[in-house]
Amino acid sequence: RDGGHPDPEAVHLINEAERLAYADRDMYIADPDFIPLPGKGVATMLDPTYLKQRAALIKPNTSLGKAQPGDLGEVPLGSYTGTEHGTSHITVADKYGNVASMTTTVESAFGSFHMVDGFILNNQLTDFSAEPRDETGAPLANRVSPGKRPRSSMAPTLVMQPGANGEPDALTAALGSPGGSVIIQFVVKTLVGMLDWK
């Protein structure tokens, strides 16, 4: 904290951590019904030893530039990042304490350009990687397959205070964001600003 102002060193560390996280996301994460996460799944990707190795790549005065994905074993998948637009986020609360945090998208502006009964149909399938393989010829985790869901960056978030028994108790914040593939970064930076740089 710096009197409520972002600390440049903290901003740098968050940016570099996000570069590393996105490199792994682009390499390994897709519809889990089609592409399993490497190793033991989430436990492998969040293994403390692995995360320490990734964190050691962050230098205090130098940017990683384009981060490379970590080595999580034999997973013959490549990476691709495309642009996304056409997203909105709303958060609503009522007098009874019910809260909803919802991100909605038609993907690109005007979605698929088709309207049914006043609703614009989305073109969410463009969240799949445009190419089925990366530059080396490795198949992409987020490639198109029949019945498969495209990867999404939407991150509607509820922040709760823990209760006495560890269960969620009082609501601290409800948020989300538009922004395509950088929604996750916007949500992280908003949370850090709210919770750490009050």
Segments the model singles out, each with a brief description of its role:
Residues 10-17, 171, 183, 187:
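Stable alpha-helical elements in mature extracytoplasmic
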Residues 18, 22-25, 125, 191-195:
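Sec/Tat-exported extracytoplasmic proteins
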Residues 2-105, 116:
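Internal maturation/activation junctions in enzymes
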Residues 143-146, 175-179:
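Glycine-anchored helix-breaking recognition loops at helix->coil/strand junctions
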Residues 3-5, 34-43, 135-137, 161-171:
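Intrinsically disordered, low-complexity coil segments
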Residues 1, 176-197:
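Alpha-helical support elements that line or immediately flank enzyme active sites
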Residues 29-31, 127-134, 173, 198:
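Acidic/polar loop patches that form or flank catalytic/metal-binding clefts of enzymes
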Residues 93, 98-170, 184, 189:
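Active-site rim segments in enzyme catalytic domains, especially the processed small/beta chain
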